[in-house]
Amino acid sequence: MSTLEPEKRRQHEDKSNEIIDSPIFLNKISALPESENVHCLLLKQLIGSPQLKQTWQFNFCVDLNFLLENMHASVFPTVDVRITHGYDSKSDSLARLTAQMNHCPVNVKLYSVYVPMWGTHHSKIMVNFFKDDSCQIVIHTANLVEPDWIGMSQAIFKTPLLYPKANDSLSTSSVPEYGNPSKIRKHEGSLDIKDDRNCDIIDVDSAFENFKHKSDTRSSDDLGVIGRQFQQDFLAYLKNYRHTYELIEKLKMYDFSAIRAIFIGSVPGKFEGEEESSWGLGKLKKILKMLEKDSKKDEKTKFEESDICISQCSSMGSFGPKQEYIAELTDGFGCQRGNWKFLFPTVKEVQQSMLGWQSGSSIHFNILGKTAASQVETLKKGKNLCKWVAMKAGRQRVAPHIKTYMRFSNDGELLRWVLVTSANLSKPAWGTLEGHKAKSRSTRGLRIRSYEAGVLLYPKLFEESQRAPCIMTPTYKTNTPNLDEKRREFYGKRVIGVRMCWDFPPVEYEDKDEIWSPVINRTDKDWLGYVWPPNW
């Protein structure tokens, strides 16, 4: 949804354009200048409202003390905190988290999740409920630990505030006027909405955007189909837990029609037949194929063979003895091997990052693995492997924990689609096909081992009847697209920004560049004066 001031939006419309700010946010890094933190978010802006009533946190690593530090102290006596973590039941990490829970001043429930071998509970999701009965879903890339939020690059997608459907009520208590859906509908077109929460948490302009949708010539059923599909897919994901019945029943009562995103999730299991395209790489492949087919109807927006697909993440698994998984991945991403680039930091980029070698503890690749060296060599020879370059994005020294997958036009001006997700480049996260070979004894299906969550965005999601056609473009150091002279061809269109955390075009590894792997000791000190691993 657009976060532009109404006056600013009108100015752009006078130029026959409509601008929509990036639905993707980056995390705010306090050590960076303000010019590189424009539109960036703190964890406190997501869970720090004095109106927070209940929060469901789904994550891998959790520091409960850090979580509470980012909540408003006034909610401690009443807030209900539910945490689904990724720790093994016998791990020291879970023991520490349990000890924190036993000594904290808040009502906290912890939930463990079974995952098969090689799998993890890796999703990063928040479902926040507020005292006015509003709700917000946040899908992001950060663990709930301080280093992830203060020193690593992360991405955040947050839905608009969601409210109960007109015929549903979550409580019999009086609801403030700004939180009552029926009251909001009576004020269509008005921006005089009051809210006693932090203005950083609530975008009044989101309400403005919703009012605009209500006045569109299409029926509300047409406008809400994307959001209802998101709701259906998100609830299907939640059904894979044993402890989320209460949450599912609650979310069924909410109106998701304002959401413009596709939920892409992974859950453990082997998925056969139609279910193969319900999760992970199978679902992404199905949607992207439909997108590419649909794009051929419009010469100005169709996918081109020269397009560049980019995968960027903070962990790389094994691609197999002959790197056969690369073919599965590129097929899923809908691109040719020669047009696929993979961004992963070098040793030098980790060493010079804001947290120094410590950043590398969150960036995983086992170079000592049986086929790891040949895998890197294959990626280099294919000109697929690229460095972490983020000068234009303002994140060069903020090492990546973010995971992004995108398809660019060759000149980098247009984005065909964007995926922000917790999923790294691995078989457990995305899934791998079983039983598809001629002599295979097992049935065909997609095998996934981890829990992952992400959102897919593409221009058509933002289209509305009797409005300009939509295009999507990268933005740097801001969420707002910049229509300068070189983008005059954008005039007359609805332009959606996508906040970039790294630079286009990607820069390939040189022969001297060494891929980062935390299993290798480093005697060279980082800029903070530490070796790796540190002697703490």
UniProtKB/Swiss-Prot annotation:
Give the Pfam families listed for this entry.
Tyr-DNA_phospho (PF06087)
Q: What is its EC number?
A: 3.1.4.-
GO CC term (a single one)? nucleus
Keywords tagged on the record: DNA damage, DNA repair, Exonuclease, Hydrolase, Nuclease, Nucleus, Repeat
Subcellular location per UniProt equals: Nucleus
Gene Ontology process terms (BP): base-excision repair; DNA repair; DNA topological change
Which residues are annotated as active site? H122 (nucleophile), H401 (proton donor/acceptor)
- The UniProt record lists the keyword Lipoprotein: no
The GO terms this record gives for MF are: 3'-deoxyribose phosphate lyase activity; 3'-tyrosyl-DNA phosphodiesterase activity; double-stranded DNA binding; exonuclease activity; single-stranded DNA binding
UniProt-recorded name of the protein? Probable tyrosyl-DNA phosphodiesterase
Q: Which organism is it from?
A: Schizosaccharomyces pombe (strain 972 / ATCC 24843) (Fission yeast)
